[in-house]
Every structure is written in C-alpha cells, then in structure tokens.
Amino acid sequence: SLAWELTNIGNSVGIFTNGSRVLGLGDIGVLASMPVMEGKAVLYDRFVGISATPVLIDTYDLDTFVETVVHVSKTFGGIHLEDIRVPDCYAIENALMERLKKPVMHDDQHGTATVTLAAIINACKLIGRDLHSSRLGQIGLGAAGSAIARLALAYGVGDVMVTDVSEAAKAPLVEAGATATDLATLLREADIVVATT
C-alpha cells in the first residue's frame, strides 16, 4: 500500500516488552525496563538506520499483551519482542506470527542465537575447524539456549548435544534432531561448548 512508500512504516520497528525477564535483572517491571528498550532503539538507529520505538505493555496476561501488539501493529514494519519471561515469550511470539503479516522477532531467542552462531562460525574459521563435522554442546535451554541449539541444527552443525536442569526442556530439541545428554558427558565429548542461563 502507499502507506509503506509514503510514510516511515516500512523503516520502523516496535520494541515490545512487559519487563518480565530483563537480562541480568529478572522481573523488574515494565517501567524499569525502559532504558534497555531505549538502548535497543539506539542500536537499530545507529547500525542500520531503522526507526525503533519502545512500547511498554504493563501486563503479564498473554492475551492482553498479544491484543495490544496486534492493535498497534500497523504503526510498524516489524515487531521486536524483548525481555519477556519463558514460557510466555514462546506463546506471544507464536500468536503474533500467526496473526500478523510482518516480521516478528524475539530478540532473546533469535538475536542471541544469530550472534552466537556467527561467533562460532568465525572461531572455527580462525582455528581451521569444520563446523559441519563438529559436536556442539549447549548447556541451558531457556529462550536463548533453545534458539542457539535450533539454529545450530538448521545450519548443519555435525551434532548438537543439549543439557539442562529441566528434563522437559530437552524433549523439543531432541524432536528437532539434537542429542540429549548430561553435563559431564557434554563437557567431555563436545568440541564447542555454549552455556546460557
């Protein structure tokens, strides 16, 4: 539509949070999370020239959060989810991806996984290791750890081993092709180890 050509919609992202899982700080609430959201907006502007606007949604109710994002989504070309607790972040992301016809990214999953895989690829190049025949061990299967393991599988890492204090956290990754193991075995057998909380 002309709105994408004649307005800033196509060059904008809404950064949505409820402050329920801010890195290193935990559940600090929506207002206290604002400096982190403003920092993300600065990164978008400085590095890629995208206009990003923090949107603080003061609720832990998943339906209210999703409906709020849906109602204001026409304002933005993309949706960036930030610092939302597990498992709520998965449900919110899935609901928005089903309902919106625009990019939806959960930074704590996709952003972290992308930069982690990039670092691993570059490290392997520097030391002459073939990542596709290597064994990667992922310790911790929260939002970031699960996404790192999934992206490593999609990229074609030789074998992805996973472990977590929660046995239930391993099951979806085993379904996706990872090998569940214990911490001692992972540390002994993995060529590359990534640990997340």
Name each region found by the language model:
Residues 52-53, 105, 160, 181:
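A local structural micro-motif
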Residues 59-65, 86-89, 109-113, 168-169, ...:
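Short acidic loop-to-helix transition motifs that present clustered carboxylates
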Residues 18, 83, 106-108, 164, ...:
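Acidic side chains
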